[in-house]
């Protein structure tokens, strides 16, 4: 247990931030998984693009709040975009 008032406050603040960061990260990961699941189930292009936009938004919100680093956000969006683009390209060719 902290002895100083400022140390007690740091414990409160860090616990509050931990819970918020966990919520941002969980939301982001669930939306990414939804996109990947839609690709695996061969859903329509419109549906995948809608899920992809929501995933991008969740990733950006997590980065904006500081839950993840901006470079990690960029990397996650880029890798997800590559997978979506590959699927949509294959779908156009009728594979």
Swiss-Prot record:
Q: Which keywords describe this protein according to UniProt?
A: Ribonucleoprotein, Ribosomal protein, RNA-binding, rRNA-binding
The record's Gene Ontology biological-process terms are:
translation
Protein name in the entry: Small ribosomal subunit protein bS20
The protein's matches in Pfam families, at most eight in alphabetical order, are given as: Ribosomal_S20p
Stored InterPro entries = Ribosomal_bS20, Ribosomal_bS20_sf
- Fetch the Gene3D superfamilies from UniProt: Ribosomal protein S20
**What are this entry's molecular-function GO terms?**
small ribosomal subunit rRNA binding; structural constituent of ribosome
Q: Which gene encodes it?
A: rpsT
> Does the record carry rRNA-binding as a key word?
yes
**Any single Gene Ontology cellular-component annotation:** small ribosomal subunit
Recorded hits in HAMAP family, A to Z, give: Ribosomal_bS20 (MF_00500)
Q: What does this protein do?
A: Binds directly to 16S ribosomal RNA.
Asked if the record carries the keyword RNA-binding, the reply is yes
Query: What's the family?
Result: Belongs to the bacterial ribosomal protein bS20 family.
């Amino acid at each position: 247990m902290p002895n100083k008032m400022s140390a007690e406050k740091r414990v409160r603040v860090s616990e509050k931030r931990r819970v918020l960061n966990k919520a941002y990260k969980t939301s982001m990961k669930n939306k990414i998984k939804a996109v990947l699941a839609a690709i695996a189930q061969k859903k329509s292009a419109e549906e995948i693009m809608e899920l992809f936009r929501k995933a991008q938004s969740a990733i950006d919100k997590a980065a904006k709040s500081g839950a993840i680093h901006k470079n990690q956000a960029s990397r996650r969006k880029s890798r997800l975009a590559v997978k979506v683009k590959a699927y949509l390209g294959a779908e156009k060719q009728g594979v």
